[in-house]
């Protein structure tokens, strides 16, 4: 039988996936009890219903250190989620306890692979009642990365040709759909097994990077690079004068002097989240969700033996 002390402990602790060893990566994840966070000034605390996860988080300095490079482990990974607000910090406006929300959390704070998370209110957007928590959690990083890469950094215009690497992935599939809606002609790339999925999301051509010649696509106006390396360099050479390569994997060398090379880190933006979720509601934007698992059995989903397909989602609450 549970004691009063056990019940009190349950009120102040939560389950969370924690990392302590950068060398171990996702294999070093541990499920443990952590204190439930409190809402600081301009914060809210959200009861997490579903969390997304990006495997490269294990390579990000922000997972392991704070902004002045001090070790901040044990830390909780995961930075995109959907859930319900349980408390408001001083100064918070426009949100309320019990509200359904989704959003992107600060890279340098404990994340969303937990039952609760504290997050700045400005990083959250209302999650409409007709969008479930699993879908909501799949949108922030992939959707905002695609939106900012195309429209802020890529300056996409109707009639342009866009080359999208990783076309069947969580980000690439969003890029394809938003670029098509923006009036672009879209060429996707990937492996042979990705062809049909890329076409299903809207790619008008597809390049199998293992068997086709990338340069056969001709000149393009915009490259969205999620690969880097040699593919990134070769892609830069395809850009027309005045065109742009946007990268989420670091700077890319090469390209003509009259082309723009932009590498960026996605940022939270409430207005853009609103635009993205409205497109989901309207049927104009489809999510690309892969494995879905619970918090207690998340390790298999976060450490897959095969190639990842789509966004990994951890359901924190049934």
What annotation goes with each model-predicted range?
Residues 190-194, 211-212, 247-253:
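Short, polar loop motifs at secondary-structure junctions
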């Amino acid at each position: 039988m549970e004691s009063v002390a056990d019940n009190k402990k349950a009120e102040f602790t939560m389950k969370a996936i924690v990392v302590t060893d950068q060398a171990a990566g996702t294999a070093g994840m541990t499920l443990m009890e952590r204190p439930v966070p409190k809402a600081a000034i301009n914060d809210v605390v959200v009861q997490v219903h579903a969390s997304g996860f990006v495997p490269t988080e294990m390579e990000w300095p922000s997972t392991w250190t704070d902004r002045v490079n001090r070790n901040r482990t044990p830390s909780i990974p995961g930075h995109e989620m959907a859930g319900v607000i349980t408390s408001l910090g001083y100064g918070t406006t426009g949100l309320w306890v019990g509200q359904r929300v989704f959003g992107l959390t600060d890279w340098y704070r404990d994340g969303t692979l937990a039952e609760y998370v504290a997050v700045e209110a400005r990083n959250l957007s209302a999650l409409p009642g007709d969008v479930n928590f699993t879908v909501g959690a799949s949108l922030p990083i992939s959707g905002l990365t695609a939106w900012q890469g195309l429209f802020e950094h890529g300056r996409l215009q109707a009639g342009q040709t866009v080359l999208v690497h990783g076309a069947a992935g969580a980000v690439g599939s969003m890029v394809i759909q938003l670029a098509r809606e923006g009036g672009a002609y879209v060429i996707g790339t990937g492996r042979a097994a990705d062809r049909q999925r890329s076409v299903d999301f809207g790619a008008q051509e597809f390049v199998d990077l293992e068997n086709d010649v990338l340069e056969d696509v001709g000149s393009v106006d915009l490259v969205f690079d999620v690969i880097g390396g040699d593919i990134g360099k070769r892609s830069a050479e395809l850009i027309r004068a005045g065109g742009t390569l946007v990268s989420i994997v670091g700077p890319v060398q090469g390209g003509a002097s009259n082309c723009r090379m932009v590498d960026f880190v996605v940022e939270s933006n409430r207005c853009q989240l609103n635009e993205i979720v409205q497109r989901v509601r309207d049927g104009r934007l489809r999510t690309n969700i892969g494995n879905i698992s619970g918090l207690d059995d998340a390790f298999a989903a976060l450490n897959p033996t095969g190639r990842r397909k789509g966004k990994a989602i951890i359901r924190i609450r049934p």
